[in-house]
Amino acid sequence: MGSMLTRLAPLTTTGVGSLPFARPADAVRHAVGAYELPFCPQLPRAYGDMVQEWLGADPGRCGWAPDRDRQLPAAWDDFVLEVIRHPPSVGVVKLQVTGPLTLAVALEGRSSRRCTDMPDLAREIAGWLAAAVSDQVRTLADVGLATLVVVDEPGLMAAQRHGACGGVWDALRAAAPAWGLHVCGEVPWRWLDAAEPDVISYDVMRYGCDRAAQATIRRLMRRGGRVIWGVADAVAPEGPSLIVDRVCAAARAVAGRRWRTADVLDASLLSGTCGTGGSEVAAERRLARDLLLAAHLLRGDPLPAVPSPPRREDEVSVDRDRVADL
């Protein structure tokens, strides 16, 4: 795990999962070209939300249709072709997988008959998901790419109320060189801590970085893991300056008195707060651009050449001065 994650530069940018494009080829070109850690996007406008993409049009049964086993993401073929044509420089890509707990909760909620044991259903789904993910990870390995698998669990708190336990992810943990958890809702930090993922991705804009979060992220860093800060919202873009402020505040909170803020930043990645499948394409492009500018400012890199309206030189100077004060 460690060697793969150490290939990623501090404050590497990535997307969460869904994108607002209708055509897989357009979505994939953006996911590979606009982010430093490319990812295979979900396309809710064309194929339904993250649950429908995996469960299909009839998720109303507590079971698994034959065509769901080893199902590939809708953009998969285009993604593989794109990363072969334009491989990431560090040889790492990300797969975002709808989590077994979220799928189990969805199946239970939509079924005409109640599923009596959601945790058992989630473990069964996890096995099926792991089979599909293992195939995808092997395909990417065959073209020289290592894969970070991030399990997307927006239904985590609901699953916890149903009695689910962290062992549900064991099959997915074993399916990739490194694995993580993304939670766009309220985060049960003790549960995430006990699960010991290699990467934690969450919405720091909405949920902040309280003591429970700080303790969990410190332990994550001691294991050589990474935190993906969800620091920008495509619905209400704020620009790179506020992203820089937000990342620095979270890093200082985790560092406390015993760590260096720079060490926390070294273990950080940047993303939006959630997938942007419900946003406009222009908003997603701006989000990716703002994240990239913020990352370059925080790292002290030369500003990248991105297709965007020119920023005033005084704005850039203010940003650089703020970072220099860390």
Residue ranges of each PLM-predicted region?
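Alpha/beta catalytic barrel-like cores
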Residues: 1-118, 198, 225, 239, ...
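Non-membrane alpha-helical structural segments and their capping/turn regions in soluble enzymes
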Residues: 25, 69, 73, 119-134, ...
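A short acidic, amphipathic alpha-helical/loop segment
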Residues: 27, 31, 190-195, 212-220
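Surface-exposed amphipathic alpha-helices with a cationic face
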Residues: 80-84, 137-141, 169-176, 221, ...
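Active-site loop segments of alpha/beta catalytic cores
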Residues: 95, 117-209
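Active-site beta-loop-alpha junctions enriched in small/polar residues
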Residues: 98-100, 154-156, 184-188, 205-207, ...
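Hydrophobic beta-strand scaffold residues
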Residues: 179, 226-228
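A short, acidic, amphipathic alpha-helical segment used as a generic capping/interface helix at domain edges
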Residues: 210-219, 240-263
